[in-house]
Amino acid sequence: MTALWPRIEPLLDRVEKPARYIGMERGAQVPIHRPDAVSWLLVYPDTYEVGLPNQGLQILYEILNERDDAAAERGYAPWTDLEALMRARSVPFFSLDTHKPAGEFDVIAFGLAAELVYTNVLNCLDLSGVPVRAEARRDEDPIVVAGGHATFNPEPMADFIDAFVIGDGEEVVGDMTEVIGAWKRSGRVGGREAVLHDLSLIMGVYVPSMYEVEYDGMAIREVRPRYPDVPATVDKRTIADLGEWPYPKNQLVPLIEVVHDRLNVEIFRGCTRGCRFCQAGMITRPVRERPLEQARTMVAEGLKRTGYDEVALTSLSSADFSGIGELVSGIIDGQEEACGNVGVSLPSLRVDAFTVGIA
C-alpha cells in the first residue's frame, strides 16, 4: 500500500479547515488490506462537513469492515483549495482512514443522495486518475459503483458508473464483495466484462454495459440485455427486517463542526403517506419499523459512546413510528433506557401527527 500522508501533510497548513483531511475520528476504523480481501472506498461526493453524518455511508462502512473478505475506508470530496494543491503536485484523491490512493482500491462506491453531486463524482474520478468514462477502464482499474436515492434514475450517470445499486445496500454489498473477491482470486479471468456480467445477476444491481439500447431518432425504441441470463428488468433491493440491521453501532464523531452534528438513530424506513412531491416516500417502500427496544438501546449506547447531548430519531415521518411516544419520553424523562438530559430532534415531522405527548 502506498501511503500519501507525507505528501498530504505539508499541504494542510495552506488550506481552510485542515482537519477535514486527517481522519482518526472516534468510531473510525483502520482496516487491514489483505491481498485476498476486496477493498472498498466509500465516497460521499461532497465536503467532509456534509458527508460525514451520512448514515448510509456509515452503515456500509461498518457492515463491510465486519467481514473477513472486505476492507472499507471512507472518502470525501476535497474543497477547492486542497484540490488545486493536489492537482499542482500530482497528489491523487485519497481515502481518509489510511490516505491510500483511490485508484488502488478494488471498488470506489459513491453515495448519490441528490443529482447536484454528479459533477463531484466525475471530479473525484478525475482526481483519482481513474478513467471518467466506464468504457475506458481497464481490468486493473477500480469497479466504480453508485448507490443512493438518485440512482433510481441512473441513466444520466450511466456512461460513468460501472454498476448501480438500486434500493437498500446492506445485503447487496456482501453479494458484490463475494463476486468481486471470486474474480480477484481467479486471477481476473474473463477480464472486466466477466465481473460486470456476474454483478448484473445480483438482485438490485444495474450494470449499464450489459444492455444494448436501440433508438428511434431521439427516442428509445428498445433496451435489450446482452446476455440471456441478464435480467431485462432490474428490481430494487429491499431489506425485509430493519431490526436485523442495527447500524451504525459506532457512529463517527467528527473532528470539526458538521451538518447534523448529533447522534442519528433510524427508527423506520419507508413511508405510508404517499406525498406526490416526495421521491423518497415512494422509492423506500414498504414501511419497516425498528423494534422499540432496539431503538432504545441504540439511543442509549450511542449517546454514551459519542458524548452527544442531542439525538435525531430519523425517518421520513418520525411521528408515525408506532412507539414514538414511549421512545421520546424514555429519553427525556431519564428512565432506565435513557441517558440523562438530552435533546431530541424529530426531522420530517408532520403537523397532523404531532401530539402534546411528543411535545
Task: Give residue ranges: language-model regions.
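Helix-enriched interaction subdomains in cytosolic or periplasmic regions
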Residues: M1-P18, R67
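Short hydrophobic segments within beta-strands
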Residues: V43-P45, G75, G111, G147, ...
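Iron-sulfur (Fe-S) cluster-binding segments and ferredoxin-like electron-carrier domains
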Residues: C278-Q294
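Low-complexity, highly charged intrinsically disordered N-terminal segments
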Residues: W40-P45, E49-M86, S90, A102-E104
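Glycine-rich beta-alpha loop elements in corrinoid/cobalamin-binding modules
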Residues: A77-P225
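N-terminal [4Fe-4S]-dependent radical SAM core
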Residues: L12-L41, Y48-E49, P208, E214-N264
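Conserved SAM/AdoMet-binding glycine-rich loop
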Residues: V43, L116, E301-A359
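N-terminal pre-triad scaffold of radical SAM enzymes
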Residues: L42-D46, L64, V253-R276, L303, ...
